[in-house]
């Protein structure tokens, strides 16, 4: 079995941060990425289980995977093209 979270282009550690900080950091990080690059987000704020998927939909990025059964939560985002 392949670990989808292995080898992302960038990693963002949002542990200990609370809403809205994790999403603000994701937005800032993604802004400096090239379309198609991947970002691993590691967070422990329960609000990210709603906020990260919503951010991806709104900003037209792809949420490739999420692991939210236990903390730390992990999300793998692929930057959309624009």
UniProtKB/Swiss-Prot annotation:
Localisation per UniProt entry: Cytoplasm
Major subcellular site: cytoplasm
Record GO cellular component, one term: cytoplasm
Superkingdom per UniProt: Bacteria
InterPro entries recorded: Sulphur_carrier_TusA, TusA-like, TusA-like_sf
Gene Ontology MF term list: sulfur carrier activity
Pathway the protein acts in: tRNA modification
Active site: 19 (cysteine persulfide intermediate)
Keywords of the record: Cytoplasm, tRNA processing
Any one GO BP annotation for this protein: tRNA wobble position uridine thiolation
SUPFAM superfamilies recorded: SirA-like
Sequence similarity: Belongs to the sulfur carrier protein TusA family.
Quaternary structure annotation from Swiss-Prot or TrEMBL: Interacts with IscS.
Chain's role: Sulfur carrier protein involved in sulfur trafficking in the cell. Part of a sulfur-relay system required for 2-thiolation during synthesis of 2-thiouridine of the modified wobble base 5-methylaminomethyl-2-thiouridine (mnm(5)s(2)U) in tRNA. Interacts with IscS and stimulates its cysteine desulfurase activity. Accepts an activated sulfur from IscS, which is then transferred to TusD, and thus determines the direction of sulfur flow from IscS to 2-thiouridine formation. Also appears to be involved in sulfur transfer for the biosynthesis of molybdopterin.
PANTHER family named among the record's database cross-references: SULFUR CARRIER PROTEIN TUSA (PTHR33279:SF2), SULFUR CARRIER PROTEIN YEDF-RELATED (PTHR33279)
Protein name (record): Sulfur carrier protein TusA
High-level lineage: Bacteria, Pseudomonadati, Pseudomonadota, Gammaproteobacteria, Enterobacterales
